[in-house]
Amino acid sequence: MRKAVLVLLLFLLACAPAWSQDTEYAELIKKGMKALEADSLSKAETIFLQAIAVKPADKASAVLYQYVGQLRVRQERHKEALEAFNYALQLAPTSQEVLMDRASLNIQMGRESHALNDLCDLLTLNPEHAEALFFRAYIYAEQHLNAKARADYERLVILQPRNREARLGLALLCDKDRRPQEAMEHIDVLLRYWPDDATVYAVRGGMYQKRRNYELALRDMNRAIELEPENPDFYISRALLYKDFHKKALATADFRKAVDLGASAQECASMMLDAE
């Protein structure tokens, strides 16, 4: 984030004389940048707000509001960050960067309907915005609007054939839609691009498990653990697989290993009771 902040604020500084002969605005931006370089987030925020107060209605201040919002997100002050992004969009309602920032924050806050509004507005401005396509597809999938989710994922894969997250999302969506052949085709492409991606093996293992092809499922789960032996989620997945074909001792051992690696002891204990 810091690099992007500095680049855009340097742009503001370069343009400031054209906006106003008053140098106070530019001086405050310089001070804010120095505070940011020193990682003094609260101080930087205070100074940027002082700069905004000098020129509150200027479109340039939309950028400052945006970065105040980003600083607040870093401090987990989400409601205040949302307020800053709202002010930024009042000054620059078609800013793609701020729309994306606000959409991302709304997703973090569990406000998917608000995020969806911003993503749709952003994609109206720029139909090929990759990040917006991905997050809108994700929200559509969560809302069980699978046709809309598929359209966004497919558009994104056309734009970025090596977009791992989009292909993975499309594979999972196809599997959910009971289109197993298409799901496996997307998995094959993923493994062609990323042959050592543990997550892809785990996902394919889960697909085989749903089809009760336990031998292939176990092969993929083992491969995922071989590639990422410190990932507790993979041990939980393999434990659940062992449960399916009544290997209770092996399932219990994997649950315990997952706890050792940081998984929730309470959740794993509940699953272990079912396995014993």
Where are these predicted regions, by residue range?
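Short coil turns that delineate tetratricopeptide repeat
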Residues: 56-59, 93, 127, 161, ...
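A conserved position within tetratricopeptide repeats
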Residues: 52-56, 89, 123, 157, ...
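Helix-start (N-cap) detector for alpha-helical repeat units in TPR-like alpha-solenoids
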Residues: 25-26, 59-62, 96-97, 130-131, ...
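N-terminal leader/linker segments that initiate helical-solenoid repeat arrays
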Residues: 18-67, 74, 276
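Position-specific recognition of the canonical hydrophobic site in helix A of tetratricopeptide repeat
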Residues: 36, 66, 73, 100, ...
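Structural signature of tandem alpha-helical TPR/SEL1-like repeats
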Residues: 40-46, 75-87, 109-121, 143-155, ...
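Canonical tetratricopeptide repeat
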Residues: 63-67, 101, 135, 169, ...
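Terminal, low-structured helical/coil segments at or just beyond the last alpha-helical repeat
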Residues: 240, 244-276
